[in-house]
């Protein structure tokens, strides 16, 4: 049984990822969760690091949308913010991979951290408002 995954868990995984990496793509240019060598895209690598199994290279699920993949993994223990944070990273890494940027993951990590920080600031502001400050 997996624990409930939050943006805090995703944030901890981001720090462990390399900067100089791109998402794997197939011969048609589709980004993959897993390539033939077993490398993963940024969202897939984080999901794997959290203890979930990813589709193999030849699995039809290898190119489905992230939300659908999480549903198929029965990973209903990902909160909405965690899924959104993964989606942000995936979108940036996919776009920069297609542009040939060797630092695709670095930029994706940056945007994920920005999302995390924004979320935390909103949470603090809401607590202050509720406390009457």
What role is predicted for each listed range?
Residues 7-10, 39-43, 66, 85:
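Short runs of predominantly hydrophobic/aromatic residues within well-ordered alpha helices
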Residues 15-18, 47, 51:
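Hydrophobic/aromatic-lined pockets within catalytic cores
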Residues 34-49:
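Active-site nucleophilic cysteine motif
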């Amino acid at each position: 049984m997996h624990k409930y995954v939050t943006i805090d868990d995703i944030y901890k995984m981001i720090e462990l990822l390399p900067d100089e990496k791109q998402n794997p793509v197939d011969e048609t240019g589709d980004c993959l969760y897993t390539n033939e060598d077993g490398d993963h895209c940024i969202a897939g690598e984080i999901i794997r690091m959290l203890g979930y199994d990813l589709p193999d290279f030849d699995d039809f699920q290898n190119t489905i949308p992230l939300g659908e993949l999480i549903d198929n993994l029965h990973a209903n223990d990902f909160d909405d913010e965690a899924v959104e944070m993964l989606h942000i990273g995936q979108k940036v890494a996919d776009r920069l991979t297609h542009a040939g940027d060797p630092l695709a993951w670095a930029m994706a990590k940056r945007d994920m951290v920005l999302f995390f920080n924004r979320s935390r600031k909103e949470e603090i502001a809401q607590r202050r408002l509720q406390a009457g400050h």
